[in-house]
Amino acid sequence: MKASIYDFTLKELSQLLKPSFRAKQLYLWLYAKYKTSFKDMQNNFSKDFIAYLEQEFTLRTIEITHVRESVDGSKKYLFKSLRDNHTFEAVLLKMKDKKIDEETNAILEGEKYTVCVSCQIGCQVGCAFCFTQKGGFVRNLKASEIIQQALLIKEDNNLPIEKALNIVFMGMGEPLNNLDEVCKAIEIFNTGMQISPKRITISTSGVADEIPILAGKNLGVQLAISLHAVDDKTRSSLMPLNKKYNIECVLNEVRKWPLEQRKRVMFEYLLIKDLNDSLDCAKKLLKLLNGIKSKVNLILFNPHEGSKFERPSLESARMFADFLNSKGLLCTIRESKALDIEAACGQLREKKLSQQI
């Protein structure tokens, strides 16, 4: 089976292709011009070189099979692997962006885009509140399949080449259980799609053994920890992984995470009605995160088929956030984008091609 050209970093292609400058030319065609056929690259390459590329590599290995758009402008994408027909989802989040013109001080309004990518088909972690785990675990995604999610979404929305994207590994799967492919994808996002590591966030359920390995790679990405509870009993009931890596174990590794000045580790906290949304929980969370340069992102539980949990009121979420902010712990409430198309946090899963998304 031919390798996908999207699986190769710039360094790897430079070592593989002769002369080595061909690698940069090829990257330009792939990531700046969205070319999906080697024959479309004839301006730079000889017929012999194109024949070599066609013999050794393939290009697109996934395709968009369905798109569903939310009233807020967000879109949920169903992708299909062209190799094994398995499906997975990703989401484009569209938000308003305001900037101040340095010369005129005028407020400039625009739009910013975040792509929530998947790194696995299914998930091994088995969080009780997450719809992804109901489909079971199928396999890891390759770097090329991660990259193509963002590439195809950008192409589908006619976003200019120079339009910066934010990338969040918050789709299907646990990034630290597919760390090699995730790290390779991050390198390609940076050198190929020109996405700064500062615009990339890896969200983990807390695979503590892998956190120092990720830190040692010095990728410069943002780290987010899915905490969701303030005691081990509750967290273990929500996240079975906690029985192996409890709260103390995870926080010990987070304390060692290298932070740039002014940067913080994000803690994601899913608020579930009458389970972890009380003021007492907020007080315990404040104590847990003492000494960690952090911020808390509250997420109101997003309902899905078969779930026993309930979404808390916005009022209780605001009380929770107001308490933490009043004590100096930065806390925000995440806006539930794409809730109407079941593309919000915890609502993605593999679907059969006959299913509607």
Curated annotation (Swiss-Prot):
Question: According to its UniProt record, which reaction does this protein catalyse?
Answer: adenosine(2503) in 23S rRNA + 2 reduced [2Fe-2S]-[ferredoxin] + 2 S-adenosyl-L-methionine = 2-methyladenosine(2503) in 23S rRNA + 5'-deoxyadenosine + L-methionine + 2 oxidized [2Fe-2S]-[ferredoxin] + S-adenosyl-L-homocysteine; adenosine(37) in tRNA + 2 reduced [2Fe-2S]-[ferredoxin] + 2 S-adenosyl-L-methionine = 2-methyladenosine(37) in tRNA + 5'-deoxyadenosine + L-methionine + 2 oxidized [2Fe-2S]-[ferredoxin] + S-adenosyl-L-homocysteine
Q: What CDD domains does this protein's entry cite?
A: Radical_SAM
Which SUPFAM superfamilies does the protein's record reference?
Radical SAM enzymes
Subcellular location(s): the record lists: Cytoplasm
Active site per the UniProt annotation: E89, C345
Manner of cofactor binding, per the entry note: Binds 1 [4Fe-4S] cluster. The cluster is coordinated with 3 cysteines and an exchangeable S-adenosyl-L-methionine.
Q: Which residues bind [4Fe-4S] cluster?
A: C123, C127, C130
What's in the GO CC field? Answer: cytoplasm
Q: Which domain of life is it from?
A: Bacteria
The protein's UniProt keywords, in alphabetical order, are: 4Fe-4S, Cytoplasm, Disulfide bond, Iron, Iron-sulfur, Metal-binding, Methyltransferase, rRNA processing, S-adenosyl-L-methionine, Transferase, tRNA processing
S-S pairs: C116-C345
Q: Which GO BP terms sit in this record?
A: rRNA base methylation; tRNA methylation
Cofactor section: [4Fe-4S] cluster
Q: Which segments constitute the Radical SAM core domain?
A: 109-340
Where S-adenosyl-L-methionine is bound, by residue? Answer: G173, E174, S203, S226, L227, H228, N302
- EC code(s) of this entry: 2.1.1.192
Any GO MF annotation of the entry: rRNA (adenine(2503)-C2-)-methyltransferase activity
Q: Which PROSITE patterns match?
A: RADICAL_SAM
* Family of this protein: Belongs to the radical SAM superfamily. RlmN family.
Which function does this protein serve? Specifically methylates position 2 of adenine 2503 in 23S rRNA and position 2 of adenine 37 in tRNAs. m2A2503 modification seems to play a crucial role in the proofreading step occurring at the peptidyl transferase center and thus would serve to optimize ribosomal fidelity.
Q: What else is known?
A: Reaction proceeds by a ping-pong mechanism involving intermediate methylation of a conserved cysteine residue.
User: Entry's PANTHER family?
Assistant: 23S RRNA METHYLTRANSFERASE, RADICAL SAM CORE DOMAIN-CONTAINING PROTEIN
Task: Write down what this protein is called.
Answer: Dual-specificity RNA methyltransferase RlmN
What is the originating organism of this protein? Answer: Helicobacter pylori (strain Shi470)
Gene that specifies this protein: rlmN
